[in-house]
């Protein structure tokens, strides 16, 4: 992706095309910029796509076209892997981000093959919710105290459906909050460095044997 340094996408996908009327959740895609030296707004949501086309393949292809058009990678859940396999089969595996909370050599075989992040892990759920919470605190609404922006400055979040979804979001029942899932994943994709595991440094103890050579026979010096 040529614009990976500018922003990322987050996606809440689905695998089954046909559902009982009123029962299926929508597919959701959000695009967001991150801090960069380019001449464009930072930490800004620029795309919202919430829909459920007639078939899942149409949704997958539209998500793929958005990623290629903007030249940005995507982070999505790998427990619904059809979207990730669609990217891989079309030759765009490099657009699918790996989970940021694990090193590459710790990923499972499937995670290495298609990328994505599981939504079953409690740590991932907490990180996702706190990412949305932090974004709202910093960039949505008026900053009266001037903590994160100029005092009295109004944040710019233009997507009403996403704002309403954030207001209702329930971490214990995430299924119906499609916009919150995808927007949170977009935020996480832009903040990968926050989830990178720290490398454990182990001290190597090297003890050299020391000898006393003052006599005819060398004697080892005990510590």
Residue positions per predicted region:
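RNase H-like, metal-dependent nuclease domains and their acidic two-metal-ion catalytic environment used
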Residues: 1-98, 138-223
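Short alpha-helix plus adjacent loop in nuclease-associated cores
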Residues: 96-145
């Amino acid at each position: 992706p040529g614009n990976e340094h500018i922003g990322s996408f987050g996606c809440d996908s689905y695998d089954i095309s046909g559902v009982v009327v009123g029962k299926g959740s929508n597919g959701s895609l959000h695009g967001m910029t991150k801090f960069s030296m380019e001449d464009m707004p930072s930490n800004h949501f620029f795309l919202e796509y919430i829909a459920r086309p007639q078939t899942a393949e149409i949704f997958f292809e539209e998500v793929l076209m958005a990623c290629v058009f903007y030249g940005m990678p995507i982070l999505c859940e790998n427990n619904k892997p059809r979207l990730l396999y669609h990217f891989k089969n079309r030759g765009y595996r490099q657009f699918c981000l790996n989970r940021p909370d694990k090193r590459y050599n710790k990923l499972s075989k499937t995670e290495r093959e298609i990328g994505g992040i599981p939504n079953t892990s409690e740590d991932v759920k907490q990180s996702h919710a706190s990412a949305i919470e932090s974004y709202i605190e910093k960039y949505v609404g008026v900053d009266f105290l001037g903590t994160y922006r100029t005092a009295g400055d109004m944040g710019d979040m233009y997507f009403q459906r996403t704002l309403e979804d954030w207001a209702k979001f329930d971490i214990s029942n995430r299924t119906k909050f499609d916009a919150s899932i995808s927007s949170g994943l977009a935020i996480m994709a832009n903040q990968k460095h926050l989830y990178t595991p720290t490398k454990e440094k182990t001290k190597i103890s090297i003890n050299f044997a020391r000898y006393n050579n003052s006599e005819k026979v060398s004697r080892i010096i005990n510590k």
